[in-house]
Amino acid sequence: MANEDTANMLKECNAGVKMGVDSIADVLGDVNDTKLKEILTNNKEEHQKIGSELHEILNKMDLAGKEPNPMAKTMSWLKTNIMMTAMGDDSTVADLITDGCNMGVKSLSRYLNQYKEAEPFAKDLTRRLIDLEHQLTIDVRPYL
């Protein structure tokens, strides 16, 4: 059985991956630029791979996954739909994705600090997610 910090960190990463996948899926249909669509699709697939890895680890540890915070999910959905209705271009998509990734990096970094006793593999997985989200902010900058 994993220590409590490991379990909590993995659950938070699981919720974060779900939020990331859903957020990218919410905007993919509105993307016009082929390269931006490719960037987002590839990143979504990477999030899904990490999500599958997390799911497998959580199952082996006999732990349930965690859903994203309903309020955060609702606020994200509202912001996305309002902004896409108002402006609805690739720049808006890049802006929304950048904001979402920055929030993800901030939350994941907080979990690294909060769950100090988490096992190294859980910390490494969290860092991989941070790197993935940070890289996406870099990749979408030309579209801002």
Task: State where each predicted segment sits.
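Membrane-interacting alpha-helical segments
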Residues: 1-7, 61, 84
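Alpha-helical scaffold segments that form or flank carboxylate-/histidine-based iron centers
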Residues: 5-13, 34-49, 90-96, 121-132
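A structural signal for well-ordered alpha-helices, especially hydrophobic packing surfaces
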Residues: 21, 51, 55-58, 79-82, ...
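Short, flexible helix-adjacent loops and helix caps
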Residues: 25, 29-36, 59, 63, ...
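Conserved alpha-helical segments that form or flank metal/cofactor-binding pockets of metalloenzymes
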Residues: 37-71, 140-143
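Carboxylate-rich helix-loop segments that flank metal/cofactor sites and access channels
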Residues: 56-105
